[in-house]
């Protein structure tokens, strides 16, 4: 049976004035997930750029630059081209910083695929973030730094933030990151272990259903020890599971994280058995004015005795909604593993 499909477009088409000269391998998994039969394309003749990272540093980085250079040197050894900017005229103004990133993306021979902001959005080592003005909550976030071409919300590169407020924070974060990638703790099978926490008391049973979905994804990808916490003393159970060492730590519940605070994060005793923490509920990613619990996960411990997590994902503002949080949560694990 033959099927013929005719596509008729209506309406105007946005004019895109820029296309990169070379394709980024970092986006290949996304294309494969979105484009039917993408794997059947012959990509041997496609020119790909060299992997590239741009670090954005506070203008007063001073003698802390040596700490950051440990991370930059490791990335170079991994094969990345590494650049950084710390000019006060650029990093102290969100619009100027976005313009700099956009110029780098469009004009550099080897543009950045990743932009890592090293600094808090407030405090002694601040680099501004963006605040949206359409929800009424003034939510902060760095995503606008990645939307460089067109009027859509799709990113042209990957952006993240290593948020620190002190020399100790920075040393801890760099130690966590470099050791996680270059010298992971191999003493036991912690990297096949996960803890999934769902509190239905306010946001409803969908928090448990979300975690059950994530559990199935993890099981399908070889995770052998998956702990679920759906009731009882949430803070103590979260601390105990973190201390055992995890690959993933996931929370779905309501504002306040079921009584688990930034101070509780520091009670974990997991050393270099550091998970990626996804704490998807109101306020967990509100880093614009004070320390959020996501920042606490990243900063906890010391360079030689780290705690909590190597990375953390949260959501900003007190105006998030259960159904959307559930989708973000399940979507992360589907995107990371599937």
What do the PLM-derived regions correspond to, one by one?
Residues 1-338:
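Cysteine-dependent hydrolase recognition
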């Amino acid at each position: 049976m033959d099927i013929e499909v005719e596509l008729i477009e209506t309406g105007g088409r946005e004019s895109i004035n820029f296309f990169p000269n070379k394709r980024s391998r970092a986006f290949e998994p996304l294309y494969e997930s979105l484009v039917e039969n993408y794997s059947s394309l012959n990509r041997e003749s496609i020119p790909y750029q060299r992997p590239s990272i741009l670090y954005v540093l506070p203008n007063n980085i001073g003698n802390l630059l040596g700490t950051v250079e440990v991370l930059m040197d490791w990335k170079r050894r991994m094969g990345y081209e590494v650049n950084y900017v710390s000019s006060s005229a650029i990093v102290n103004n969100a619009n100027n910083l976005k313009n700099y990133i956009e110029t780098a993306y469009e004009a550099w021979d080897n543009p950045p695929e990743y932009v890592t902001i090293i600094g808090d959005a407030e405090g002694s080592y601040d680099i501004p973030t963006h605040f949206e003005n359409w929800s009424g909550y003034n939510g902060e976030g760095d995503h606008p730094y990645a939307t460089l071409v067109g009027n859509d919300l799709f990113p042209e590169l990957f952006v993240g933030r290593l948020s620190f407020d002190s020399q100790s924070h920075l040393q801890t974060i760099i130690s966590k990151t470099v050791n996680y990638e270059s010298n992971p703790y191999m003493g036991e099978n912690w990297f096949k272990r996960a803890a999934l926490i769902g509190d239905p008391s306010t946001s409803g049973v969908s928090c448990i259903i979300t975690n059950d979905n994530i559990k199935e994804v993890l099981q399908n990808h070889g995770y052998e020890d998956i702990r679920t916490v759906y009731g009882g003393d949430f803070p103590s159970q979260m601390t105990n599971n973190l201390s055992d060492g995890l690959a993933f730590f996931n929370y779905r519940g309501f504002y306040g994280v079921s009584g688990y605070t930034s101070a509780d994060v520091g009670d974990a005793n997991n050393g270099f058995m550091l998970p990626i923490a996804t704490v998807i509920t109101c306020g967990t990613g509100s880093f614009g004015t004070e320390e959020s619990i996501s920042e606490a996960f990243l900063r906890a411990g010391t360079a030689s005795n780290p705690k909590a997590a190597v990375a953390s994902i949260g959501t900003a503002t007190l105006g998030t909604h259960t159904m959307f949080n559930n989708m973000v949560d399940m979507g992360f694990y589907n995107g990371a593993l599937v």
